[in-house]
Curated annotation (Swiss-Prot):
SUPFAM superfamilies: P-loop containing nucleoside triphosphate hydrolases, Smc hinge domain, Tropomyosin
Positions bound to ATP: P32, N33, G34, C35, G36, K37, S38, N39
Family named by the database record: Belongs to the SMC family.
Domain comment (free text): Contains large globular domains required for ATP hydrolysis at each terminus and a third globular domain forming a flexible hinge near the middle of the molecule. These domains are separated by coiled-coil structures.
One Pfam entry name: SMC_hinge
Name of the protein: Chromosome partition protein Smc
UniProt subunit comment: Homodimer.
Keyword Plastid in annotation: no
Organism: Coxiella burnetii (strain RSA 493 / Nine Mile phase I)
CDD domains: ABC_SMC_barmotin (cd03278)
Alphabetic keyword roster: ATP-binding, Coiled coil, Cytoplasm, DNA-binding, Nucleotide-binding
A single Gene Ontology CC term: cytoplasm
Function, as annotated: Required for chromosome condensation and partitioning.
Single GO MF annotation: DNA binding
Length: 1169
């Protein structure tokens, strides 16, 4: 596996996409300081997973992106890609099958990085995993910088150990161990959660068991309620059946009355139907007469309209005939006028046509003479333009000479002034004064910088102290939160126990509490709280005294005896604080001997012996009197002829004494825990005060630092200003001397040039006089040609004008003649049409009176017929009115009958609706019984004879009251109990699985530790051996070794012991810079010989070495290049000569790096050739 290429784009100074080919095993990068060589090292470190901006010489990850220059804008993204040849398959895992692997990292301005392997988006961890065990990594020994040399050799033992672990390839083991520990931690957390959940589920199971029993009783009551409800519904059904019979009888009566009204209505409707038929006949007769009447009226109207239209036509024909005669006469006159004009125009045209030919010939001759004159004028214009060009050139040269002379004269004046100014400026420069001012400013700046450095060190130390104090405060705060959580848990447990104790003492009984409050006994102690029982006998005491735990302790019971009868519900026991004599029993120890209290209780424990075992109790039972008994620790209570044991887990008094002891212990623990919280709060408060004081000190010191910094900046600015003034003055002095010399030379040159210009200007003045004479001759010639041209143009224009006017007159006469001929033809056609129309109109008028007389006669006949029809129509309308009146009377009678029928029908429908309602209620009851799986007939058969609705309603109410007294019932308690029980079993199984998994993970940790120890020991021995071998080769003698700081191979650090030749044993810190560098090189190469990384980057490692040690260093690198690919950055010629390929980094454009590559073998061959 070896590196093939490095692609950079937008990374630091490599703004343009840049490809760096890595050829062979020895490559060197050279270039001046600041050109970007080390940016290549940063790029490689960054792409293989470096996350610290400080390691990349930046403040944030976005600093690696090109930030722009004076001529280039910043870019938004940086990208680096490394190409590896993996043909040997050294990179294992899923990428072992790839012969070439490309790893790319990109970052944008938001600082978010993206990683790619062979183009696929991956995580940073995937990139780091690729190089695990190969010796490559962002902090591995494969990338060695100049600063890293001293860091490596002076590293802490635990930091130096990391390099040996990387060489051993056990970094993947450590990663696996971290993952395993993380899984163990998560498994343990899961196990703790399972334990907590299981404990909570156990409590839920006990609670749900009680709820499930109540649910069973509730179901039994509900079943009884269901049976009674079914019988009650059957009773209701029977009552509804009786109502149904009554409704059927009433419906039959109403139905008979409705049928009577229907018969009467049918008769009336028959009469109405007959009257309607009669009315229809009369109506048809009326319609027929009316139709004839209105038809005749329409005929009369049409005749009247025809008469009117005929009269209008006759009037129109007469008007048209008169207009026709007027137009005919006008057309006759117009035709005569047009024929006269035609004769006149034909005569004029015969005289104009011969004259047109003569005028056109004269115009052509005038145009020819004009063309000759224009040609003469054009030739003169050409000659004039040539003369003007020659004159212009002479004038231009003369003007140039005048301008040059004026320029030289002004230049001479300016140069003389500049010379005087330069001489004056040289005298004004004050170099000595600036040097005197710079010296004290420089001393003051050095003093302020020293003070700033001291303040900065103090600020750094104070910042570390503040960070440490903050961490301590955070630890205290976390501890306080833990203590508070524990206190809250204790208080919650105590509250729970107090609630149980209050329930056991009857304090939750509202009526009893009210009575005690009324007697001011609410705060009096209870007997159960005043008993102290010897350990082990709590169950026995609870068995005997459980009914007296809630007894109220009073000084005297007598004052309350009268009010005891006012207790409405519940039980109240009062105990007086008096001594009670107890009978002596000597058969065995008594139960009273196991109880202590200042309140009397012996009367309730009199005659009760105790026995440790059941056998002892049996022995005592045979000798017991009637008022004696014996009880065991387990609560088995035996009398002479009886035995009792109480296991009422649900009873409030169960476990009362144990809970009381636990409650007392919890209260003591709460006080202790509260004290711990107070101590932690005080400690946190003290830490916060210290932190505030430290921050105040830091702010004060920061103000001092800022003040010093501002003062130093001011002094440095003044120093820079004075230094710049000095540099400027020195540069100005040099420039003034050079300028003075140049000014004198320019004055001499300018004087010589002015003499030449004056001579040439005199020659041009002579030429200008000759040109003026020639100009006057050409102007006289131009005036002659211009006068001749004007005369000929006027003549040609006059001839063309006469020809045009004659042509226009001829064309106008011909057009007018054609138009007149067309007008005469059109008028003759109109005269013919008017004659034909006049004859037709005369014929219409002669025949128009006959149709008008016929129409008037027909109109008179139809008017007489309309009068007859009017009389007949009035008679028919009278007959129709009489029929309608009779029909209305019958309709009114039918409406009254219909109203009575509707009332009867409504009453019938009301009865039917009532019957339907009863029937629906019956059906509903039957359906309800069916839905509840009851059969009506069966329930009716089983129903007792004495059953009534009232008695069954009373039974149901009583049963419902019993159910209500049970209070809220969790019907799902049975299923919840089974579900929680199933979950509890599952959690028990999960607990076993987690315990097994935890054991497996612990075994895996032990195995990883064994492998790590073995691998580390083996690697350590080999590296130590190689280090002891390489050190003398590099130093030319001496010895060195590695030592472990501890015997534990998992945590032991590694230190370096080195003794250069000729020196006694010294610590590594006493070596010189060159000796440290050589020692570090020996150690790095020892690691490489054991586990060679794919490539090694050496960044100016040879800088602190002299020539002899550089030679040794190069010889060693040359030998190792047979196994390892090297990329060396150096300024040393010896190191550079060793490389096979050279790559130069240049910065021709400020802030932008570029690569130039040279093959050394080819270059040497070219030189030798």
């Amino acid at each position: 596996m070896y590196l093939k290429t490095i692609k950079l784009a937008g990374f630091k100074s490599f703004v343009d996409p840049t490809l760096i080919p890595i050829r062979g095993s020895m490559n060197a990068i050279v270039g001046p300081n600041g050109c970007g060589k080390s940016n290549v090292v940063d790029a490689v470190r960054w792409v293989i997973g470096e996350t610290s901006a400080k390691q990349l010489r930046g403040q944030s990850m976005s600093d690696v992106i090109f930030n722009g220059t004076t001529s280039r804008k910043p870019v938004g993204k940086a990208s680096i890609e490394l190409h590896f040849d993996n043909s040997e398959g050294r990179i294992g895992g899923e990428y072992a099958k790839y012969g070439e692997i490309a790893i790319r990292r990109e970052v944008e301005r938001d600082g978010q990085s993206n990683y790619f392997i062979n183009g696929a988006h991956v995580r940073r961890r995937d990139v780091v995993d690729v190089f695990l065990g190969t010796g490559l990594g962002p902090r591995s020994y494969a990338i060695v910088e100049q600063g890293m040399i001293s860091n490596l050799i002076e590293a802490k033992p635990e930091e130096l150990r990391v390099y040996i672990e990387e060489a051993a390839g056990i970094s993947k083991y450590k990663e696996r161990r971290r993952e395993t520990e993380s899984r163990m931690r998560h498994t343990q957390e899961n196990l703790d959660r399972v334990n907590d959940i299981a404990e909570e589920l156990a409590k839920q199971l006990r609670h749900l068991k009680r709820q499930a029993n109540a649910a069973e009783r509730y179901k039994a009551y509900k079943q009884e309620e269901r049976a009674l409800g079914a019988q009650f519904k059957v009773l209701q059904w029977k009552a509804l059946d009786h109502k149904l019979s009554e409704h059927d009888q009433a419906i039959n009566q109403k139905n008979t009355r409705r049928e009577e009204k229907q018969s009467e209505q049918h008769r009336i409707e028959t009469e109405i139907e007959k009257m309607r038929e009669q009315l229809t006949d009369v109506n048809e007769k009326h319609n027929a007469v009316q139709k004839r009447y209105y038809g005749l009226g329409a005929d009369i109207a049409r005749l009247e309209q025809r008469i009117k239209d005929t009269q209008e036509k006759i009037h129109q024909w007469q008007s048209e005939l008169e207009e026709n005669e007027n137009v005919w006469e006008e057309l006759q006159n117009n035709t005569a006028e047009c024929e006269a004009q035609i004769t006149e125009l034909e005569t004029e045209l015969e005289h104009l046509k011969p004259r047109s030919s003569d005028i056109h010939s004269a115009a052509a001759e005038a145009s020819k003479e004009l063309a000759q004159a224009e040609s003469n004028m054009a030739r003169w214009q050409e000659a004039w333009e040539a003369f003007q060009a020659e004159t212009s050139q002479t004038m231009s040269q003369l003007e140039v000479m005048r301008t040059k002379r004026e320029h030289c004269e002004r230049q001479l004046t300016d140069l003389e002034k500049s010379k005087q100014q330069l001489q004056q400026n040289l005298k004004q420069l004050q170099l000595d004064q600036l040097l005197n001012e710079i010296a004290p400013l420089s001393s003051q700046s050095e003093l302020l910088n020293a003070e700033l450095s001291d303040s900065q060190s103090k600020l750094q130390s104070l910042a570390e102290t503040i960070a440490s104090r903050r961490d301590a405060n955070q630890t205290t705060r976390e501890e306080l939160q833990t203590q508070r959580r524990e206190l809250q848990a204790l208080e919650a447990r105590a509250a729970s126990l107090e609630a149980l104790q209050k329930a056991a003492l009857g304090e939750s009984d509202g009526k009893i509490s009210e009575w005690l409050s009324s007697q001011q006994l609410k705060e009096n102690p209870r007997l159960g709280q005043k008993l102290v029982v010897n350990p082990g006998w709590e169950i026995a005491v609870e068995t005997v005294l459980s009914g007296f735990f809630d007894a109220v302790c009073v000084d005297a019971a007598l004052p309350f005896l009268t009010d005891l009868t006012t207790v409405s519900e519940g039980r109240v026991t009062l105990v007086e604080k008096k001594s009670v004599s107890a009978s002596a029993f000597d058969k065995a120890p008594t139960l009273a001997s196991q109880v202590k209290s200042e309140w009397p209780f012996q009367q309730w424990l009199a005659g009760i012996y105790i026995a440790d075992t059941l056998d002892q109790a049996k022995q005592l039972q045979s000798s017991l009197q009637e008022n004696e008994s014996v009880i065991t620790k387990e609560g088995l209570w035996l009398g002479p002829h009886w035995a009792r044991i109480s296991k009422l887990q649900d009873a409030p008094q169960s476990g009362f004494l144990l809970r009381e002891q636990q409650l007392k212990q919890l209260k003591a623990n709460i006080l202790g825990q509260q004290k711990k919280c107070d101590e932690q709060e005080a400690l946190l408060k003290s830490g916060e005060q210290q932190l505030n004081q430290l921050e105040t000190d830091r702010d004060t010191l920061l103000q001092t630092y800022q003040k010093l910094n501002a003062e130093a900046t001011t002094v440095q600015s003044a120093l820079s200003t004075k230094q710049a003034q000095l540099d400027n003055a020195q540069q100005q002095q040099t420039r003034l001397k050079i300028g003075l010399n140049e000014c004198e030379q320019q004055i001499e040159q300018c004087q010589q040039q002015l003499t030449l210009i004056k001579n040439k200007a005199s020659s041009l003045d002579d030429s200008q006089g000759l040109l003026a004479t020639r100009r006057e001759e050409m102007i006289r010639e131009r005036d002659h040609y211009r006068t001749q041209l004007i005369e000929l143009r006027e003549k040609a224009h006059q001839k063309r004008k006469e020809a045009d006017e004659l042509e226009i007159r001829l064309a106008s006469n011909e057009d007018q003649l054609s138009l007149l001929r067309q007008t005469v033809a059109r008028d003759q056609r109109q005269l013919k049409q008017l004659t034909e129309r006049r004859e037709m109109l005369s014929q219409y008028l002669s025949e128009g009176d006959k149709p008008l007389e016929e129409l008037n006669e027909k109109l008179q006949t139809q008017l007489e017929q309309r009068l007859i029809l009017e009389t007949e129509l009035r008679e028919v309308e009278k007959e129709l009115e009489e029929a309608n009146q009779l029909l209305r009377h019958l309709e009114e009678k039918r409406v009254s009958t219909q109203k009575a029928l509707n009332e009867a029908q409504a009453q019938l429908e009301e009865l039917r609706m009532q019957r339907q309602t009863v029937s629906v209620r019956q059906t509903t009851i039957k359906e309800q019984l069916s839905e509840n799986d009851f059969d009506l007939e069966q329930v009716m058969a089983e129903l007792p004879e004495e059953a009534t609705i009232e008695s069954w309603q009373e039974k149901l109410d009583q049963l419902v009251e019993r159910i209500q007294r049970m209070g809220p019932i969790n019907l799902a308690a049975i299923e919840e109990y089974e579900s929680v029980n199933e979950r509890k079993n599952y959690l028990d199984k999960q607990h076993a699985d987690l315990t097994e998994a935890l054991e497996i993970l612990k075994n895996a940790i032990h195995k990883i530790d064994r492998e790590t120890r073995a691998k580390f020991q083996e690697t350590y021995d080999q590296v130590n051996q190689q280090f002891q071998s390489l050190f003398p080769r590099i130093f030319g003698g001496g010895r060195a070794t590695l030592e472990m700081t501890d015997t534990d191979l998992l945590t032991a650090g590694v230190i370096v012991r080195a003794q250069p030749p000729g020196k006694r044993n010294v610590t590594i810190h006493m070596l010189s810079g060159g000796e440290k560098a050589l020692t570090a090189v020996a150690l790095v190469f020892s690691l490489f010989q054991l586990n060679p990384a794919p490539f090694c980057i050496l960044d100016e490692v040879d800088a602190p070495l002299d020539d002899i040690n550089v030679g040794r260093f190069c010889q060693l690198v040359k030998e190792m290049s047979k196994e390892v690919q090297f990329l060396v950055i150096s300024h040393n010629k010896v190191t550079i000569e060793m490389a096979d390929y050279l790559m130069g980094v240049t910065m021709q454009e400020p802030g932008v790096s570029r690569i130039v590559s040279v093959n050394m073998q080819e270059a040497i061959g070219l030189v030798e050739a």
